[in-house]
Amino acid sequence: LSRGLGDVYKRQEFVQSIAALPKMCPHFHLSLQSGCDTTLERMNRRYRSAEYAEKCGLLRKYLGNPALTTDVIVGFPMETEEDFQDSYDFVESIHFYETHIFKYSRRHGTKAAAMSGQLTEAQKAVRSDKMLALNEQHAKEYEKSMLGSELKVLLEEEVEINGEQWYIGHSMEYIKTAVKKQDNYSVNDIITVKAEEFLEEHTLTGEVLSLIHISEPTRQEAIS
């Protein structure tokens, strides 16, 4: 989805093509850095918030409810309270699944390090905390939006929760999902789960509907 893809039509054609791929995971990490155009200009970024929003809209148009994640820097030199609020409002409007938040760190030899208007660590911390709270809200809301959906889940490990054995994995959207341990599936298998509730914070669980891929041929023969 970079600028190299050219005009809107070509970007739309590209998104349509990846949406048709059966093995494509609908999880896209699109680094934003800031939702404020003034700050993006100071960062020498070659895109603006409207273009970024348009690309997010294309992904949602053709992939339904994909997981969109991003990176945001707070406290870049000369970032005013208004600039930060613009960035915050933009992040809120896109409604990312996850936002990785970084406080600007001055690095010797960079152009940004020589800029005036360096913010204090206390100012950066306040802005970071606000973004972190928004991120937590968005993550919970996205996970909740998946309740009732059928998720394809790769089982990654066996754990004990409240005295019971569970398999933990991630869906194609990278949502943490747990199912009770059973003999007909195991770690490294891919299953379909109907998400019904939260087992614990940020972990969905539900009914296993089918086995999509069994990792060991011998186990597959035994089950069949």
Named regions from a protein language model:
Residues 114-211, 215:
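Terminal RNA-binding accessory module
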Residues 3-98, 104-123:
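Conserved non-cysteine loop/helix-boundary elements of the Radical SAM core domain that shape
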Residues 39, 168, 222:
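Conserved beta-strand positions that form and line the central face of beta-propeller blades
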Residues 28-30, 99, 155, 194-195:
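OB-fold and OB-like beta-barrel modules that bind single-stranded nucleic acids
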Residues 1-9, 212-224:
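Single conserved hydrophobic/aromatic residue that forms the stacking wall/gate
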